[in-house]
């Protein structure tokens, strides 16, 4: 009788199976932000600010790329300024105007 009960007993796992996890990854940073500082000289085509959306708006002599990157249209000096309470913009002042 005792032998019959033991033969019907099942061995159950006492550790969970090694399933996959949901959160086991992380993407690399996108290297966004300022690439040139206020007062720094830049050449035409230089990237000034890399961003997603328009955190900083383009001002005089600054263009905006398809990915919202701000870049210099002419040689000059970078000038960051505030537009009202919430907006910021960056301009490039030609070298003769910056002094």
Swiss-Prot record:
Classification via InterPro entries: Ribosomal_bL27, Ribosomal_bL27_CS
Pfam families the record matches: Ribosomal_L27
GO molecular function: structural constituent of ribosome
BP GO terms, sorted: translation
Region (Disordered): 13-65
Keyword Coiled coil: no
Keywords assigned by UniProt, alphabetized: Ribonucleoprotein, Ribosomal protein
GO CC list: cytosolic large ribosomal subunit
Gene3D superfamilies: 2.40.50.100
Family: Belongs to the bacterial ribosomal protein bL27 family.
Protein name per its UniProtKB record: Large ribosomal subunit protein bL27
Biological source species: Lactobacillus delbrueckii subsp. bulgaricus (strain ATCC BAA-365 / Lb-18)
